[in-house]
Regions:
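PLP-dependent amino-acid enzyme catalytic core
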Residues: 1-166
């Protein structure tokens, strides 16, 4: 079991190989992907503390994804049912694309542009992640490649029409 250190971000509590402790963790990737993943890791480590990058990211989050922060609503019935604990929910359905996944897609597209890449690549199960990456990729002028599991395709083939439309 991993012991967390107070006052230190979880993302910084791993060894040089990416292990967070226990029998799981780290990364196990094919040899051909080690360099691209290493390059991405170096860039990410630099940009996650870069005030200009974070300011740009926050601009997209608050001005492009949604005009200002997405709102919260109080869940009155659940609050009453639980006996007084106030329960609130964030209404991310008002964000561009209608899901929270747009935030990760925007950040991935920004990283992709910074690396000089032309393609944004992702996977999707139910289609939301692919949809959000398609929206972000279009905004940043990137081509998008979305992978979906073989067994998911027959049930969600209508999603491909949406990807092509975006």
């Amino acid at each position: 079991m991993m012991k967390l250190k107070k006052g230190k971000l979880l993302i910084d509590q791993h060894d040089k190989n990416g292990f967070w402790g226990g029998k799981f963790g780290g990364n196990f990737v094919p040899e051909t992907l080690k360099k691209p993943i290493g390059d991405l890791t170096v860039l990410f480590e630099r940009l996650r503390r870069d005030k200009n990058f974070l300011k740009e990211r926050d601009y997209y989050y608050t001005s492009w994804v949604h005009k200002g922060p997405t709102p919260f609503i109080k869940l009155e019935n659940l609050t009453k049912y639980l006996g007084g604990a106030q329960v609130w929910a964030k209404v991310v359905s008002e964000a561009r694309g209608g899901a929270h996944k747009i935030y990760g897609a925007i950040t991935a597209a920004m990283l992709c542009k910074r690396m000089g890449k032309k393609f944004l690549v992702t996977d999707t199960g139910a289609g939301y992640n692919g949809k959000m990456f398609s929206i972000a990729g279009k905004h940043f002028g990137l081509k998008v490649k979305v992978f979906m599991g073989f067994k998911d395709i027959p049930f969600l083939s209508f999603i491909f029409d949406l990807f092509n439309f975006i």
